[in-house]
Each structure stands twice: as C-alpha cells, then as structure tokens.
Amino acid sequence: MRYLRFKRWLTELNQTTDGIDAVYFEEVRRHAGVDAAHAYGGFMAHLTAWCEHHQIPYQGVPVGTIKKHATGKGNAGKADMIAAMQALGHQPEDDNEADALALLYLAIEQGGMA
C-alpha cells in the first residue's frame, strides 16, 4: 500500500499546487541492506513512471553531488549539511530536511534539467 499512497500523494500535490514542472530526487547508489534497496527501487519505479505518465521531467542527483554542492565536500557528514543550510538562513529539523534543501538549491542553480 505504501506505493499506492505515494502515487496518490504525488497526484494530490500536483493538483493542489500550480502543478509540478520538474522532479529532482536523491539518487542513492548504496544501501545499508536488501530491504532498503527494495524499498528505494519501488519508490523510484513509481516516481519515474508517474512523472513519465504526466510528462514531467525528472532527474536523480547522486548523494555526493548534493553534498559537494552544499559544502564543497562530497563526503560531508550530517552535521556539515545541517550547518550549510543554517548558513543560508534555514533551520532544518534534521539531516534529511537539510539534504532536501541542498537538493533544492542545486536544482535552482542549475536552472532546470541538466
């Protein structure tokens, strides 16, 4: 059911905003375990299929690229990512929010799909 809820959430987000013009997502190339890899693969499959169905461009960005753009180091730690976003005036609740903000800044700076 988690994948159906995810697709429903994407559709609701698309309908309750001015629409989604592009999707950037963190491209994880290494997983801690088999379950994590399966879950990630399932979400990525549904995300890319949903984007293609709605003709929305999408791009995965490697974790190291996001970290390097935000901190100058491709292997930056969680505290480094949080500090980088705080330096930009944000107060991320955790490293996941900091990573999402860093990805947003990267996407904006690229000016669209690379």
Where are the regions a protein language model picked out?
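Phosphate- and other anionic-substrate recognition elements at nucleic-acid/protein interfaces
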Residues: 1-114
